[in-house]
Design a protein with these regions (language model features):
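Extracellular zinc-dependent metalloprotease catalytic-domain scaffold
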Residues: 1-82, 88-233
Length: 233
């Protein structure tokens, strides 16, 4: 990410600034605190201050202490952390920012059948065996639809709105989508098995996810939008 010199306030009242000097990386502040008790909101996450290219400079992640034991019992806490980091970096949060005056529209199509139009993300989607365009979630509530990969197509990939028991790999598809956002990330990803011929946005019917075998994280998270824009050196 670009270098920034200046002062950026903490997301938390009474704490030292998140940045006070020069930063050439993303700074993520994390808090474990009560939110709403067990079984409700697991966490909140998103970019806070962004560069003028709409790459994240600082972000924040809150996790509800009342849900930590539950997540540990499912062996999913680490996956939840990395999933929320994805949102901080811009997955589902910085795809479309034209309403801020910056010409980036990585999510296209109707809300009923949205897709990701970034070149790198689609190269890896097709290389993994997917057909058509990389599908974005079209079902669920406001925290699910339009801000995750489509569960019915991508199953256990980490950035769908549903975390499966067992492995939830961060695939080359997500890594490629970060390059489409503008990050200088590697194209490497964890081992991910997408059946060849998996349909993308051209499909007309979608498989139902089995909520008995994992965690619908998208129903239990609040995705935050950026609050400030900084000018780079």
């Amino acid at each position: 990410v670009p270098s920034f010199t200046g002062t950026i306030p903490s997301a938390f009242l009474g704490f030292e600034p998140a940045i006070d000097g020069t930063a050439d990386d993303v700074v993520i502040e994390v808090a474990l605190a009560p939110i709403d008790g067990p079984g409700g909101i697991l966490g909140q996450a998103g970019p806070r201050y962004v560069h003028n290219e709409f790459l994240t400079l600082t972000g924040v992640m809150f996790f509800d202490v009342a849900d930590l034991a539950f997540l540990e019992s499912l062996d999913l806490f680490e996956e939840v952390i990395v999933h929320e980091m994805g949102h901080v970096l811009g997955v589902g949060t910085l795809w479309n920012v034209e309403h801020y005056g910056y010409p980036r529209t990585l999510r296209e199509g109707p809300d009923s059948n949205p897709y990701f139009n970034g070149h790198k993300g689609n190269v890896h989607w097709n290389a993994e065996g997917g057909l058509g365009e990389l599908p974005i979630e079209n079902e669920g509530g406001p925290g699910t639809r339009l801000s995750h990969w489509r569960e019915s197509s991508m199953n256990n990939e980490l950035m769908t709105g549903y975390l499966n028991l067992g492995e939830n790999p961060l695939s080359r598809i997500t890594a490629g989508s970060l390059k489409d956002l503008g990050y200088g990330t590697s194209n490497k990803g964890e081992s991910y098995d997408l059946p060849k011929g998996t349909p993308g946005v051209d499909i007309s019917e979608f498989a139902e996810s089995n909520e008995g075998q994992g965690l619908n994280i998208a129903k239990m998270e609040i995705i935050l939008e950026p609050i400030g824009l900084v000018t780079n050196e």
